[in-house]
Design a protein with these regions (language model features):
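Structured, soluble regulatory/oligomerization domains located on the cytosolic or IMS-facing side
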Residues: 1-95
Length: 95
C-alpha cells in the first residue's frame, strides 16, 4: 500500500487523474508489478490525517523497492501539477 498524505480540501478528481497518468507511464517499465495498481482513493488514518491510497501486487521481495519508486513518482507528479501536500511533523504522545 502506498499512502500519500493529502489535505481534506484537495481536488480528488485531479489526484485520480495524476495518479492514473503516472501508472500509465511507469507501470509498464516495472514487470515486477504483477497486476495493474488498484487506486483505492482517499482514506483517513488513525491519527486523523487524510491519505490517498494506491495498492499494488508485486513479486515477492520487491515491495519496498516498488513502494519507494512509486511514492517518489506520485509525489513528484502531484507537486509538479500544483497539488499541495502536507508535511507531517512529529506526532505528540500527549500527557
Amino acid at each position: 500500500l502506498i499512502d500519500i498524505p493529502i489535505y481534506a480540501q484537495t481536488d480528488l478528481d485531479e489526484i485520480y487523474r495524476i495518479i492514473s497518468k503516472v501508472n500509465e507511464e511507469a507501470v509498464p517499465e516495472h514487470p515486477e508489478i504483477l497486476k495493474e495498481p488498484d487506486v483505492l482513493g482517499p482514506q483517513m488514518a488513525s491519527n486523523g490525517q487524510f491519505n490517498f491510497r494506491i495498492s499494488m501486487i508485486v513479486q515477492g521481495g520487491m515491495q519496498i523497492s516498488i513502494y519507494h519508486i512509486f511514492y517518489r513518482l506520485y509525489h513528484e507528479a502531484l507537486l509538479r501539477e500544483g497539488i499541495e501536500l502536507p508535511t507531517l511533523g512529529p506526532l505528540s504522545k500527549g500527557k
